[in-house]
Each structure stands twice: as structure tokens, then as C-alpha cells.
From Swiss-Prot:
HAMAP family: ClpS. Gene3D superfamilies: 3.30.1390.10. This is ATP-dependent Clp protease adapter protein ClpS. Belongs to the ClpS family. It comes from Synechococcus sp. (strain CC9902).
């Protein structure tokens, strides 16, 4: 919240001057991508997605898996760089193909 500082105008009335508000720059966001996987079963991919990214519902995990299956790549989640790297590396450690890229 900006601080207000009273000042006197020439007519004697007090005028409140607001200090400029600070705008926080939003940190860049990254997309975690799942690439099509011809090796693992659809059930394994969905289960792994839900284990690694707890925010995903069963329906979300299925949608990501089907998007990757049908188009070659599915969007798992958009988040800050640290969790994006964690999710990507954890998916890879479980045998899935994943990458991250900056959000547009």
C-alpha cells in the first residue's frame, strides 16, 4: 500500500500526495511438456503424471496423456522455473519424455 504524505496547498487545505506504487515484476513462467511415449502404457503415464504433479486431477492427467498421444506433445502445467525443472526431471526419472520451455 502506498504511503500518503500530507502537504499544504497555498489556500491552507491539506493535500495528500501518494507515493508511487511499486509494481512487482512477475517471474517468468515455464511450460512443462510431456512428449508422446510409445513404450509405457496409458495407465502408467496417467498414474505417473498424478504422482509427480499432485495438482492434476485424474481427468487432467488423462487429457495431458491423450494430447501427447494424439499430437505428439501435451501441456502438463505452467509454473515458475524451479518447480518446472523438478517436474520435468522427475517425469524423466520415471521413464517419460518431458521438456520445459518458456511460456509465450
Amino acid at each position: 500500500m502506498a504511503e500518503e504524505t500530507p502537504t499544504r496547498s497555498p489556500g491552507g487545505a491539506a493535500v495528500l500526495d501518494k507515493a508511487p506504487e511499486r509494481v512487482r515484476k512477475r517471474s517468468p513462467r515455464y511450460k512443462v511438456l510431456l512428449h508422446n511415449d510409445p513404450v509405457n502404457s496409458m495407465e502408467y503415464v496417467m498414474t505417473t503424471l498424478r504422482q509427480v504433479v499432485p495438482q492434476l486431477s485424474e481427468q487432467d492427467a488423462m487429457a495431458v496423456m491423450l494430447e501427447a498421444h494424439n499430437t505428439g506433445v501435451g501441456l502438463v502445467i505452467v509454473c515458475d522455473i524451479e518447480p518446472a525443472e523438478f517436474y520435468c526431471e522427475t517425469l524423466k526419472s520415471k521413464g517419460l519424455t518431458s521438456s520445459i520451455e518458456p511460456e509465450d
